[in-house]
Swiss-Prot record:
Organism per entry: Salmonella paratyphi B (strain ATCC BAA-1250 / SPB7)
Family the UniProt entry places it in: Belongs to the FGGY kinase family.
Principal location listed in the UniProt entry: cytoplasm
Gene3D superfamilies assigned to the protein according to its UniProt record, in alphabetical order: 3.30.420.40
GO (cellular component) term, any one: cytoplasm
Catalytic reactions of this protein: (S)-4,5-dihydroxypentane-2,3-dione + ATP = (2S)-2-hydroxy-3,4-dioxopentyl phosphate + ADP + H(+)
InterPro entries: AI-2_kinase, ATPase_NBD, Carb_kinase_FGGY, FGGY_C, FGGY_Carb_Kinase, FGGY_N
Molecular function GO terms recorded: autoinducer-2 kinase activity
CDD domains, sorted: ASKHA_NBD_FGGY_AI-2K
Record localization: Cytoplasm
Keywords carried by this UniProt record: Cytoplasm, Kinase, Transferase
Annotated EC: 2.7.1.189
Designated name of the protein: Autoinducer-2 kinase
Length: 530
């Protein structure tokens, strides 16, 4: 039997395993929250042949990649495995893993797997077309990416898997299970299944029963930062961690990212600027939006929820623009030894606020109940090359991302009554100083940018540390460890310009959605079941 380690005897480092959409990372931190080393590997989630919308999660291959990252991080840190006081895991949300009665993982899908479009439509018709509203009022989730239609899809198309299913967890819980052999979920990640009650932070089995599905496959629920188990001998041999090292319950990537940013008190607000942009506001008590426009998720802080309004493909749109139109700028930036985005921001800083009226049409404001977007386009272009060029379009994209953020925050405030007085801007987007200032000018809020802009792994490490007594409180530790890089105050003149631009964009976007409705253009993205 493996001997159990405590943090006092095993060393002064914590490990976070971060299973993102595009990659998996093992990150080692010291007890001051400083990142010491990281091992990272990209992974892909491939479609199943003849299963439209599918995004399979390769359990065997991805576990090998996770082990590779753990070994790489230990090697880079030049520390023995005994120096790791505890390990915790976080992941993309919505992705689920199915286990059989022997505890073997037998099926998994990634976060935006959309194979169950027919099942979403079928479920919406239950209870005189009120089932989705019942799910939302209880869990804060709609059916589009929840576990309910995916389980129904398995019942319809893979009964061999469905009837063998004994337990379901999230991907972060799967990583912790592979390390410890113990199965449990945490509220922050499991909340995105649409099966967790926001008030009790526990399963609402009746939702599965209403859908005609089995309700005996739900794992125990444990709070983030509590002990799950210990590294097994088998896992130790696979990934070179020390058998007996504590494994601590982790959580969802966004909520743990907020913990790492110190966004842990009611009314605190963050904009997380990655591939998607998440506008997140902490609410003091569970409440849902009567219009079902935004999602409500359990925070990792017990008793607290977060309302989240999502901008779609914001970071991806910027990357598309850079790669499709800015080959020259990429070469120049490489010669100068700077990032291409920095060069493009420098060019865009010479364009006046409002970008000469150019209106990008990409992500809409979040409309969770009926979630789709207009066709990607630029509206109101000019053929004057002095006014309409790459710098103008790049600035217009940054301004538009901030406008969509402001609209998302406004609809959160409208139903919750929680009005932010400042916000934290993190993620890759916050590296841009111009973008950070534009966000301040558009929202009219002071924007705080942290030193650690990718804070999910830090939040996960905080959970690990709390679990073994390094720290006593998630919230207090998050506030203690966050450090600030810079602050951006809004410019009142620019705010007035952007208010007008925002009103025009909202009107134009509505017309662009009508073109999708009429079958004349193709949506940027449409939720399953629409």
């Amino acid at each position: 039997m493996a001997r159990l380690c405590t943090h006092t005897e095993s060393g002064h480092y914590l490990m976070a395993l971060d299973a993102g959409t595009g990659s998996v990372r093992a990150v080692i931190f010291d007890l001051q929250g400083k990142q010491i080393a990281v091992g990272q590997a990209e992974w892909q989630h491939l479609a199943v042949p003849d299963v439209p919308g599918s995004m399979e999660f390769d359990l065997a291959k991805n576990w090998q990649l996770a082990c590779q990252c753990i070994r790489q991080a230990l090697q880079k840190a030049a520390i023995p495995a005994t120096a790791i006081a505890a390990v915790s895991a976080c992941s993309m949300r919505e992705g689920i893993v199915i286990y059989d009665s022997n505890g073997e993982p037998i099926w998994a899908c990634a976060n935006v797997d959309a194979r169950a479009a027919h099942e979403v439509s079928e479920l919406k018709e239950l209870h005189d077309n009120t089932f989705e509203e019942e799910v939302y009022r209880c869990s804060g989730q709609t059916l589009a990416l929840s576990a309910i239609p995916r389980l129904l899809w398995l019942a319809h198309h893979r009964p061999d898997i469905y009837h063998r299913a004994s337990t379901v967890t999230m991907i972060s819980d799967w990583m912790a299970f592979m390390l410890s052999g113990e199965l449990a979920v945490d509220p922050s990640n499991a909340g995105t299944t649409g099966l967790l009650d926001l008030v009790t932070r526990n399963w609402k089995r009746s939702l599965l029963q209403m859908a005609g599905l089995r309700s005996d496959i739900l794992s125990p629920v444990k709070e983030t930062g509590t002990l799950l188990g210990h590294i097994s001998q088998k896992a130790a041999e696979q990934c070179d961690l020390q058998a007996g090292t504590p494994v601590i319950v982790g959580g969802g990537d966004v909520q743990l990212g907020c913990l790492g940013l110190g966004v842990v008190r009611p009314a605190q607000t963050a904009v997380l600027g990655g591939t998607f942009w998440q506008q997140v506001v902490n609410l003091p008590a569970p409440v849902t939006d009567p219009n079902m426009n935004v999602r409500i998720n359990p925070h990792v802080i017990p008793g607290m929820v977060q309302t989240e309004s999502i901008s779609f493909f914001t970071g991806l749109t910027m990357r598309w623009f850079r790669d499709a139109f800015c080959a020259e700028e990429k070469l120049i930036a490489e010669r100068l030894g700077i990032d291409a985005y920095s060069l493009l921001e420098d060019m865009a800083s010479r364009v006046p606020p409002g970008a000469y009226g150019v209106m990008p049409i990409f992500s809409d404001v979040m409309r969770f109940k009926r979630w789709y977007h207009a066709a990607p386009s630029f509206i109101n272009l000019s053929i004057d090359p002095e006014k309409c060029n790459k710098a103008t379009l790049f600035r217009a994209l940054e301004e538009n991302a901030a406008i969509v953020s402001a609209c998302n925050l406004q609809q959160i405030a409208a139903f919750s009554g929680v009005q932010a007085d400042s916000l934290v801007f993190a993620g890759g987007g916050s590296k841009g100083k111009l973008w950070s200032q534009i966000l301040a000018d558009v929202t009219g809020l002071t924007v705080h940018v942290p030193v650690v802009k990718e804070a999910t792994a830090l939040g996960c490490a905080i959970a690990a540390g709390v679990g073994v007594g390094v720290w006593s409180s998630l919230a207090e530790t998050g506030e203690k460890l966050v450090r600030w890089d810079r602050e951006h105050k809004p410019n009142p003149e620019n705010f007035a310009v952007y208010q007008q631009a925002r009103e025009k964009w909202q009107a134009v976007y509505q017309d662009q959605r009508a073109l999708v409705d009429g079958g004349l253009t193709t949506s940027l993205w449409k939720a399953p079941g629409l």
